[in-house]
Amino acid sequence: PPPPPPSPRQYLDDHLQGLFLAHGMTVVFVTHSMAEAVYLADRVVMLAPQGGGLVLDQRVDLPRPRDQDTRGSPGYAAHIHDLATALARWAPGGVVA
């Protein structure tokens, strides 16, 4: 069977990526979604909840342009794991939602 169509959020992520690639724009994008951050970013910066100190500054070296198949790649999964590990150090009780 064909893959399901992208969700509205995934559609918007693809549209935003198309805009900044087509126009050579730099975008500062704030999100609470690790999946969205890894999909869109060339660099992810994670700030601590108290005081805003730097928790993580990581390059995302996935090739561009990215498509929804990127979300199933080993490199994508590795970046998500790194973010979740960093977040777990700062989440109350080490629990990541």
Regions found by a protein language model. Name each.
Residues 24-30:
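Conserved H-loop
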